[in-house]
Amino acid sequence: MINPNRQIVLDTETTGMNQLGAHYEGHCIIEIGAVELINRRYTGNNXHIYIKPDRPXDPDAIKVHGITDEMLADKPEFKEVAQDFLDYINGAELLIHNAPFDVGFMDYEFRKLNLNVKTDDICLVTDTLQMARQMYPGKRNNLDALCDRLGIDNSKRTLHGALLDAEILADVYLMMTGGQTNLFDEEESVESGVIRVMQEKTAEEIKSAVDFSHNLKLLQPTNDELQAHLEFLKMMNKKSGNNCLWDKRFGNNNVH
């Protein structure tokens, strides 16, 4: 059963990937990094492990993540950590940037051990790259670009590393979806300042409080901007279990 309040932001590094056929075939996971969020708050219950592969890493892959064969020589094999890893992610929503890459590798590793399990069977997988593409159509949406766009410090990211990338992705995800505090937590956020004002005041009261005497220029969104906004509201409404406050307060019939 999926726990909707528990999210694990996950990243992997590998020995390489294939340009043709299955991208994972013949390769191995060599690092897993994961950051746990419960009710959109960091718990500190993170996971990080290096794994000894059964083959050398490709030189091009080493240039990306900097993990050499010598660094992995004394690390456990995947079969030694597989069950603990499965227990850790079981029942969570996995947040992964370009999820098909990592999930493909994870399921491949499970199959090599004859484990009768697929990631989708025990987790809800959310691809944050697809989320970003919906929110920022036509723009670059890799982690570096998103950090620049959202004002997140990624200065420590000189090489790819699974735990560091998971930590950065957690920051990116929370910024893309409204911040660390859950907007829809009845006991905390709904009682907080801005949202409480939105609950107590009607749309007419808010409108009447605005001074229109200064002849401010009214900026209209483009069709592309409006569509991106609607897609964002759809995503927020889905994430909140159909509790999108914009929809509830102002009767936005476009959010479903």
Curated annotation (Swiss-Prot):
Q: Which cofactor does it need?
A: Mg(2+); Mn(2+)
Database matches in SUPFAM superfamilies: Ribonuclease H-like
Annotated catalysed reactions: DNA(n) + a 2'-deoxyribonucleoside 5'-triphosphate = DNA(n+1) + diphosphate
- GO terms for biological process, alphabetical: DNA replication proofreading
> Which residues take part in binding a divalent metal cation 2?
D11
Q: How is the cofactor bound?
A: Binds 2 divalent metal cations. Magnesium or manganese.
What does the UniProt keyword field contain?
DNA replication, DNA-directed DNA polymerase, Exonuclease, Hydrolase, Magnesium, Manganese, Metal-binding, Nuclease, Nucleotidyltransferase, Transferase
Which EC class is this protein assigned?
A: transferase
Write down any Gene Ontology CC term.
cytosol
Q: Where are the catalytic residues?
A: H160
Q: Which residues bind a divalent metal cation 1?
A: D11, E13, D165
Record-linked InterPro entries: DnaQ, DnaQ_proteo, Exonuclease_RNaseT/DNA_pol3, RNaseH-like_sf, RNaseH_sf
Superkingdom field: Bacteria
Give the EC number(s) listed in the UniProt record. Answer: 2.7.7.7
Q: Does the keyword DNA damage apply?
A: no
How does the annotation summarize its subunit structure? DNA polymerase III contains a core (composed of alpha, epsilon and theta chains) that associates with a tau subunit. This core dimerizes to form the POLIII' complex. PolIII' associates with the gamma complex (composed of gamma, delta, delta', psi and chi chains) and with the beta chain to form the complete DNA polymerase III complex.
Q: What is the protein's known function?
A: DNA polymerase III is a complex, multichain enzyme responsible for most of the replicative synthesis in bacteria. The epsilon subunit contain the editing function and is a proofreading 3'-5' exonuclease.
Q: What is this protein called?
A: DNA polymerase III subunit epsilon
Source organism of this protein record: Haemophilus influenzae (strain ATCC 51907 / DSM 11121 / KW20 / Rd)
